[in-house]
C-alpha cells in the first residue's frame, strides 16, 4: 500500500504522501497506519461547513478540509476578520474536536499562503498595509502554479523571491514563463482579483481505494477495478445534471 497522507510528527521522519507503506515504516518504525474512512471525512467536512455558514454565506469549498471565506461584509466582531477566524477555529475545536489553520488576508492568493504559514494549528494574518513587505520576501515556491519545472527555471534565472520577480517586466515574464507570466506579474505583487465562487462546479468525480497489500496480477487489478467503476457510477448518480458520463 501507499501513504495517502500523514500527520506532522510523521513528516519529521521523512514520511510523506504517495510513499510506499514499507518505506514509511522503515523511516518511522513506530508509525501507526490506519485505513481511510471517507464517509467519516465527509461527515466531519459537513460539520465544519455548517460552522462556516454561521459567519458568512460566501464560501468557496476547495476540498473536504479547505475553503475560502469572504467575511468582508460580516457585521460580527465589528467586521474583524481576525476575530472571526479566531472564533471559527474555536468553534471547530470545541464542537468537532479537530484543529484548524486559518489565514487572513486581502485576497485568495495571500489567504492561502497565510493559512499554510502556521500549520497544523495556527492563525496567520497579512494586513493590507503589510502586503508589500511580506510578498517581497516570499519564496517563489509559495506561488500557486509554481511546480518543479517552473521552480527549476526560476532557480536558473536566480529568482528566489517574489521581490526578485518584481524586477522583471511583463514582457520579460512572458518571455520566460509564457502565458503564466501575466499571472506571475500580479501574484508576485500580492495582487489577486479572483472573487469567491459560491456556485463552484466540480470538474471531476473520482473514487479511490488504498490497499493494505499489493495486488500481484493483472486479474487481481481488473477485479478491483470493476468494484471501483461501480462505486464511480453510484457517485455519478448522486450528482446533479451538471455531471454527464
What are these regions (language model features)?
Residues 62-66, 105-108, 241-245:
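Short Gly/Ser/Thr- and Asp/Glu-enriched loop/turn motifs at secondary-structure junctions
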Amino acid at each position: 500500500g501507499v501513504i495517502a497522507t500523514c500527520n506532522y510528527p510523521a513528516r519529521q521522519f521523512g514520511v510523506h504522501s504517495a510513499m510506499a507503506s514499507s518505506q514509511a515504516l522503515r523511516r518511522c518504525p513506530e508509525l501507526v497506519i490506519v485505513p481511510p474512512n471517507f464517509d467519516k471525512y465527509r461527515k466531519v467536512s459537513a460539520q465544519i461547513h455548517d460552522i462556516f455558514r454561521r459567519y458568512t454565506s460566501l464560501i468557496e469549498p476547495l476540498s473536504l478540509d479547505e475553503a475560502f471565506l469572504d467575511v468582508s461584509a460580516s457585521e460580527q466582531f465589528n467586521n474583524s476578520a481576525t476575530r472571526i477566524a479566531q472564533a471559527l477555529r474555536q468553534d471547530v475545536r470545541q464542537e468537532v474536536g479537530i484543529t484548524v489553520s486559518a489565514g487572513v488576508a486581502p485576497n485568495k492568493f495571500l489567504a492561502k499562503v497565510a493559512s499554510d504559514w502556521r500549520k497544523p494549528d495556527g492563525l496567520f494574518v497579512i494586513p493590507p498595509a503589510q502586503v508589500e513587505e511580506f510578498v517581497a520576501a516570499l519564496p517563489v515556491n509559495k506561488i500557486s502554479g509554481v511546480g518543479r519545472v517552473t521552480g527549476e527555471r526560476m532557480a536558473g534565472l536566480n529568482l528566489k523571491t517574489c521581490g526578485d520577480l518584481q524586477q522583471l517586466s511583463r514582457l520579460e515574464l512572458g518571455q520566460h514563463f509564457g502565458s503564466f507570466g501575466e499571472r506571475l506579474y500580479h501574484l508576485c505583487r500580492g495582487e489577486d482579483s479572483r472573487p469567491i465562487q459560491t456556485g463552484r462546479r466540480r470538474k471531476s468525480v473520482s473514487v479511490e481505494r488504498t490497499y493494505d497489500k499489493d495486488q500481484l496480477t493483472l486479474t487481481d487489478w481488473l477485479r478491483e477495478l470493476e468494484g471501483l467503476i461501480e462505486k464511480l457510477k453510484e457517485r455519478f448518480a448522486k450528482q446533479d445534471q451538471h455531471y454527464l458520463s
